[in-house]
């Protein structure tokens, strides 16, 4: 790129940075860079002196200290060692129960010499040089470094071999004749298992993927040269890989998984044009702003992604900007000269994207101007994700079978091992990309489902929906006084629906009385007025049959009935009741939800531990106010783990760390005491929604809140024992069961607690779901605090049991039920209610 545009902010409010946004191309970045020379003469001298500096990475762009502010956070977690404090698993954290199963993985060995080390040097220049390109050229021109593997980010130099002295001074001369003194000071000798070294390995693999002609978008790498087109929906899929290097137990392994980037073959300009045709011109700019700000776009001329932070309607492509050399050019001329692109619409505005700041960087915000015509929308809209046919078309291309996924991974390994350039890059650093890891897992026994009059062992262990149709639930409250609010065109569907609902209720033990039916006009305000008029203290439940899935119908009803006038509610779409052939299935699901919302219990599994409370905690961001965190807390209040206490708290915090857990836990313990006349002997809390780099904060800030509540509520004679388990549904690991010459998904209940786990943590993987198509993902569990000192077998088996207790699905789910309940609660509040639900509903699963 020959120039760098300097675009100034025009009163734009800084928005939240998107995780996927890459650094801008140098052509349109707002920054001041001093011009410099490319070549220089040099001479070397050596001097020894003490020097202590902060550690930095070999990123090539930012120091590690800077990256911690807005880069990869998962490396920070590697410094949190929890297992050493858990004496019962200090020697061994592996279980022994279950049937052994041979598993292949998507982990590859990264081999290196036994005495391998990495040496990090801090590099200073006198006088200081602003240009990293010039810094690199002057440094690399010295013969002392010419035969060594090296990586330099402008501040830190990484070498595979140690220099003769701790401090080395070099002297260079620029083409202008200026003398520059370069000082290299050894700051760290890094071993392969150090977090800094782990990050360096990831940097090396970023270079390798670049050499394989892949482009980095967010954390993943894609091949735009091999797109998969879905023309009927104007979509393109870029195949690629997610990759991470880390130490698993005693081995350094590369974790690689197949990934796809969904791109729309629709530019922002086309989107704006279509929106203009459908919107009144008086509110077009406002509507356009609401629709586009926050979206991620891709510029295909450089394969970079950006987050749209604003739209500048005052700037057009014909406007001029100043390049790095001081000359001016227009956007039209710039794109023609740089990319041979001719802009067709000279009246379009420009999009504004704010770039991520470096940590402790107080300089002017950097931003880029983007041309809508050249920006392609990424991802899928909520409307698209609700389109069954569209999602099916996407799934047919992306939902790979275990064998299909393995073939893609084998191809990647072959590319890395056979490509001369990538192999040389690895060999330069003494690394070798090795074979795939295979290991032995265990399959824990399937669970029996306990009902009121029957114990069933489902024929298909992951699904017992057929068994539920003819068996009575554990307990239910009769529904005598309730309302149905509907519009006139849905009235004819009510009688057949009620008939089917009573039929289902008769077989499951759920008594359904005749409701009061209220007809209203087809608008959200009419529904809300009818509810306000007819709901009284005797009403047990309100059912609303909605004419469409417009969000304002659902939101206004749920907000009023969850907070202002707390009554359980059930929303059903008219088109759902129109599916006469599926009415029995629809009525069964609705009956189950209504039973739960009235405080009923559907089924149970055998829990050997008595007086056990399980807790689920989840955190997300409010959809309307991104500075508001929504904390969901759900705890069991009986030994059978079938009744729940639910509370949601809104807090204003920058990080997704809860500060309300003490009050939530105290409320749960009080409810438990009210039901059982004693406190629980054990509490196991499952914490979902923990982001990368937050493990230490959870351990040091959230766990003490729970402990404080437990200590204050407990008596001197006996205090509750607490365990805290971090849950992660999204993990890179994939497991494939080896069956002859083919691979298939691992059996339900497969546990992996060795080789693919971390030595510093008490962790395991559990596969608690099945898939007819595609590849199953295991869920990752990390026990960070454990006063209960349960054996690994018992912790793993209990976790699997809890995956059977989610009442909104008659089958096994991927996480323990309290986690999923907490997720459903936070989702409802963050997306629809935007305020704390009334505690009058705390004993009911009103959010299902």
UniProtKB/Swiss-Prot annotation:
Residues 267-379 form the PAZ domain. One of its GO terms (biological process) is transposable element silencing by piRNA-mediated DNA methylation. SMART domains: PAZ, Piwi. InterPro entries: PAZ_dom, PAZ_dom_sf, Piwi, RNaseH-like_sf, RNaseH_sf. Plays a central role during spermatogenesis by repressing transposable elements and preventing their mobilization, which is essential for the germline integrity. Acts via the piRNA metabolic process, which mediates the repression of transposable elements during meiosis by forming complexes composed of piRNAs and Piwi proteins. The PIWIL4-piRNA pathway acts in the nucleus and mediates silencing of active transposons: engages with nascent transposable element transcripts and governs the piRNA-directed DNA methylation and subsequent repression of transposons. Belongs to the argonaute family. Piwi subfamily. This is Piwi-like protein 4.
